[in-house]
Amino acid sequence: MNLALEIVSIEGNIYFFIRTEERFKNLVETQMYSQYPTAEITEVEDYTKYVPKFEPGGAWECRAFEMKLDKEDAIPIKTYIDFGMDSKSLSLDEEQKIDPMTPLIEMMSSLKAGEQLWMQIFVRGAGKSLKLNETSGVVTFFKHLFGEKEDYLHLSDDKGGSQDWQAQGRKYIDKLLDEHSSTIIGEGEKAKKVGGYKNLPPDKKDLVDRVERSIMKFGFDVGIRVVYYAKKENFNGGRCPSEVTSAMRQFAAPKSASYNSLAMNADTFTNGLDFPWQDWNNMRAYKAQKKMFELYVKRAYYYPPATSKKD
C-alpha cells in the first residue's frame, strides 16, 4: 500500500490531501475518522490540473527539490514523544505543548497571490532484505545472476525499500557500544568486549535508547518532495528552498547527537548550479524543473519515471 500525503498552499490557503488507490479509499477514511472524528473528508480533483504545465519560457516559474536524512537512517528525527504529544505528556498545559506543524503551516500560509507551494510525503511499508530458503528457485536464479556471493540476498532499490532497517539499527547500536567497551571477556575467537552501555556519555545513551525505540515500531520508507510554483511576476526565490528547509528544522536538535535532521538533497535541487557558465541559457535548469514538476504530478518516487538515487 503506497500513499502520498500532501500539504498544499494555494495563495496562502492550506489544504491536506491523501493520494491513494481506489481500493484503499475506505481503509484510509476509516483510519482518519478513528483519529479525528470531526474531520471532513471529501474526494476532489487533482489540484495540479488547475495550473498550466511547466514549460521553459512560460508564464510560470518552478523550483523543486527532495529531502533526505542528514545522518544515518538508524538515527531518528524528533517524534511526537519529543513534542509532548504522547500519552505520558497529556497532563501538560496547552501552552506547554508544541505543535511541530506550526512553522511549516505558518510559512505556507504566508504565500501571496500567484504563488503555490506543494509538498508530498510518500509512504510505504519498509521491506526487509530478501530471506529465502537456499533450495528456493528464486535464490538459484539470483545465484546465476550475481554469482556465488552473499550480496544476492541483500538487493536494494537505493530508496531503502528492500533493506532490513531493523538490522541496520541494531548494527548501529552495536557499533556505538563497541566503541565504548573496555572490558574483554574470554580468549581467542570467543573474546568479546562488555560494559559498553554504562561507559557511554549521556548523549550517546540517549541515542541508543531512541534507536532501540525506533526499531521496535512499524517501519516506513518515506520520501519528501517540494515544488514551489508561481507566476513570474509573483515569484519569490527565497521561498524555496530556504523558507521550506527552515520550517522543517524543528524535527532536529543540531547540537545533539541523539537526533537526525531533514535536509535538502542538493542533487535534486532544480536550481543548484552556482555559476552562469555551468548552464548556458538555463537549459539544464529548465530540464530539471520540468522533470521534477512531472514527477510531482505523476506522484512518482519509488518507481519509474523516477530514478533511484543514493541518499
PLM region descriptions:
Residues M1-D311:
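Extended, folded cores of ATP/NTP-driven motor/assembly subunits in large transport
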